[in-house]
């Protein structure tokens, strides 16, 4: 994948960069194939609201209309080879997806690993060959391998390492658990029977793209964010004052008065703390209370 820089023929394109989409499939006329119709689904967009219509996540709404692509995160079609037919753009995620047609005729979308080509054969299962795009239990993957789409619980489907360019490394194996170094730097123990897909995800330059203008964020469904310091006191604890006034508190707070910007919100006695070997923040081993051990 490459990044194309636009000429500044308008102020908004001066700093705008776009992907050249070289990884995506095209037909003989240079056009992208249409998505598989049987794997498309309309999903009501929440716009940051809950079931009562109350805003629970600010700065969400609008954006271009999308159809959801049904992705096979479980990779539960075991022992049946499939052929990669296309590599496609997915508006619902940063990673690309590829359409796989299995020998029994079924078609599924999976996340597209880096360097997986059209025409490649993939498979899922304990006896699958060690190749990019194949899914197998973590206990059968050699140490040092980069994986993605990692399950946290057996059979639930991949829940971690699904963003563009992401990859987790298998660093240790102890008993029935396998330790993974996640993209955040955290080292976490996961059961060996959980499945993961071999390889790093494609579209690795996604984080280097500059949107260039506010309107491009609106296309993605991101609404403007207003700083609390420019609001009135009735709207935010940081608001009010003459001119550019300081916060006036010992720590920044949310619009509802709770500490923020560095304040830890994870529960100290969360049961899954015992599976975190090294935290992503301090780097130390966590004790039962979730604190980094000295």
Swiss-Prot record:
Assigned GO CC terms: large ribosomal subunit
Organism domain of life: Bacteria
One MF annotation (Gene Ontology) recorded for this entry: transferase activity
InterPro entries named among the record's database cross-references: NA-bd_OB-fold (IPR012340), Rib_uL2_dom2 (IPR014722), Ribosomal_uL2 (IPR002171), Ribosomal_uL2_bac/org-type (IPR005880), Ribosomal_uL2_C (IPR022669), Ribosomal_uL2_CS (IPR022671), Ribosomal_uL2_dom3 (IPR014726), Ribosomal_uL2_RNA-bd_dom (IPR022666)
Cross-referenced Pfam families: Ribosomal_L2 (PF00181), Ribosomal_L2_C (PF03947)
Chain residue ranges for the region called Disordered: 1-37, 228-294
Gene Ontology BP terms: translation
Alphabetic keyword roster: Ribonucleoprotein, Ribosomal protein, RNA-binding, rRNA-binding
Biased composition (Basic and acidic residues): 23-37
Compositionally skewed regions (Basic residues) per UniProt: 264-285
SUPFAM superfamilies: Nucleic acid-binding proteins, Translation proteins SH3-like domain
Transcription listed as a keyword: no
Free-text function comment from the UniProt entry: One of the primary rRNA binding proteins. Required for association of the 30S and 50S subunits to form the 70S ribosome, for tRNA binding and peptide bond formation. It has been suggested to have peptidyltransferase activity; this is somewhat controversial. Makes several contacts with the 16S rRNA in the 70S ribosome.
NCBIfam families listed in its UniProt record: rplB_bact
Subunit organization: Part of the 50S ribosomal subunit. Forms a bridge to the 30S subunit in the 70S ribosome.
Family statement drawn from the similarity comment of this UniProt entry: Belongs to the universal ribosomal protein uL2 family.
UniProt name for this protein: Large ribosomal subunit protein uL2
Organism of provenance: Synechococcus sp. (strain JA-2-3B'a(2-13))
The organism's taxonomic lineage, starting at the top: Bacteria, Bacillati, Cyanobacteriota, Cyanophyceae, Synechococcales
Gene that specifies this protein: rplB
